[in-house]
């Protein structure tokens, strides 16, 4: 709805809307209740004096400070957090301890009572203690029994006597061959070489 053009005209100083709020309140007649006593307007009564029940609007007294509002604790009613949690730490109540991989495959080691009694006597004498396991292997290490542990070592196979004699003959022939290259061989070596023909190579059956 368009406003009337009268609001653009200058407002006279005696107009009721031109005066301040305090001047308008002063111009109002005093209100009286049924008994005839003086009663302030509600706007003046609300701003002049604070209510007695609100402690924040009252001026602070010298003896006791105004009561402060108690802050609600964050941890009240919360079952997942501690009262004073440490910074940068995770909650470990629900986490189960991880089993160690080194002790998964072993049962607890039981030492017989005879070894214990012998160890106490050896400890008094200053001798090393006796253990039920060899001292080179640690107690908590798991060593799988696989055939590929010692793969770098050559396999020890039984060698037949025929193959052993053949290997010795090949070595002796190599020695004679190197001696022939560096110098003339002796007559004994030549006669021995002519008398013994080279036997055919035979593979030993395992």
From Swiss-Prot:
Q: Where is the segment annotated Disordered?
A: 1-153, 179-206
Return the Polar residues bias intervals.
97-120, 132-148
List where Basic and acidic residues composition bias occurs: 74-96
Provide the family line: Belongs to the UPF0328 family.
Query: What is the designated name of this protein?
Result: UPF0328 protein ECU01_0050/ECU01_1560
């Amino acid at each position: 709805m368009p406003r009337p053009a009268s609001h653009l005209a200058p407002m006279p100083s005696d107009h009721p809307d031109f005066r301040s709020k305090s001047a308008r309140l002063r111009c109002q007649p005093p209100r009286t209740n049924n008994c005839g006593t003086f009663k302030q307007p509600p706007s003046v009564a609300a701003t002049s004096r604070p209510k007695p029940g609100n402690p924040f609007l009252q001026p602070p007294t010298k003896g006791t400070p105004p009561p402060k509002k108690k802050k609600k604790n964050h941890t009240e009613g919360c079952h997942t957090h501690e009262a004073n949690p440490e910074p940068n730490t995770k909650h470990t109540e629900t986490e189960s301890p991880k089993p160690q991989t080194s002790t998964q495959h072993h049962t607890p080691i039981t030492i017989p009572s005879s070894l214990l009694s012998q160890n106490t006597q050896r400890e008094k004498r200053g001798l090393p203690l006796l253990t039920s396991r060899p001292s080179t292997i640690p107690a908590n290490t798991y060593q799988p029994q696989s055939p590929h542990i010692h793969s770098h070592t050559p396999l020890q196979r039984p060698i037949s006597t025929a193959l052993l004699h053949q290997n010795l003959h090949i070595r002796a022939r190599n020695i004679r061959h190197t001696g022939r290259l560096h110098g003339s061989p002796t007559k004994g070596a030549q006669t021995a070489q002519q008398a013994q023909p080279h036997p055919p190579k035979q593979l030993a059956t395992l």
